[in-house]
Amino acid sequence: MIKRNANGTWTAHNVPIGTNPAYAQALVDYFNALDPLFAKAQEKSDFEFICTLINVQGMQDAGWDAFETTQDIFETFSRLKSKVRYNTEQLHLFLVLYGLILEASYPYDLLCNLLRVISGDRYSAFCFPDIKMGKNGKSRSMFASEKLNKIKELAKEQGLEKNIEPLVRIFDKELRNAIFHSDYCLYDDEIRIPSPTRIYKTADVMNLINKTLAYHEVMVRLVKMYKATYEKPEIIDVHPDFSNDPDEKVVVMVRKGTGAIGIKDNWTQEEIAHGKIPFRLCRLLPYEQKMLQKDPLLADFPENKVDKFNKILRHFPEPVKKRLLPVFERML
């Protein structure tokens, strides 16, 4: 439906009948706004760009990628929509989904780090440090609105304000707060917020929600698309501030059908034995970790077996799933 031409411009083709117009137009607008951020960051530094895509967060095993859960919730709500019979019930679902998309941490981290990398700065696992509260030593996490303000500042410094417009356009602080505090009312064709007093037309909110769904879809697809640009393990330069060793290079770790899943040192076993320091920055599945333990030089992994098995299990009822799961786990 949405394709990028040779000039890098995204356009819509053969839009399915029944597609919401606001959603379809937002897809085009948001791809054209956000794609250049990915392209500029990749051009600046493959090393820092890959760290940004895989969202390096230090030492973690499987099961700590919150954005995977966000995508699962998105897909679950999409399936639920077809089972809900009444418009008000669908609206409640969409309002919650709107709030969840606005609160998801990774898209904020992603945009912040893309802007950092473009500026020549480095990837940071802590783009949004906690804010200290008074003299008692306590602190709190940044609110989503505060994260947005920081992203706007970074974009302004580089003349890229237009590229973050997708997030700015969909962000309604009062509506978000009302949803998560259960402080809104559906009445006739309106959504009402008692405090602060606001009245939205339901049609306007649905237009906003469709744009928000498009924003989420674009972010997910761009991450997948740019990961897939790394089809085979390749040797790349590190950031100048990463290592003092002039010979330091890294290898891009890839998974068939996914693309980049991390980076690792490019030292041979002999070089490591003579004092070179090995390292890995990656997100691996449990069975891939075992593969890497057996072969520390491994950088080219087969397709995701877990996804493959999950697609099969999805078609079975829970009792059958529980019996099949141990069988599949032994096959990994």
Model-assigned labels for residue ranges:
Residues 1-97, 236-332:
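Extended intrinsically disordered or low-complexity regions, especially N/C-terminal cytosolic tails and loops
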Residues 66, 73, 100-103, 107, ...:
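Amphipathic alpha-helices that form helix-helix packing interfaces
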Residues 86-104, 162-170, 198, 202-205, ...:
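Short, charged/polar micro-motifs that form catalytic or ligand-binding hotspots
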Residues 97-169:
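Flexible secondary-structure boundary motifs
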Residues 116, 177-188, 217-224:
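Charged/polar positions within long, soluble alpha-helices
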Residues 126-142, 234-252:
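Eukaryote-specific, cytoplasm-facing alpha-helical/coiled-coil scaffolding segments in long proteins
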Residues 164-193:
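Histidine-centered, metal-coordinating catalytic motifs and their short helical/loop contexts
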Residues 192-245:
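Amphipathic, Lys/Arg-enriched alpha-helical patches that create a basic surface
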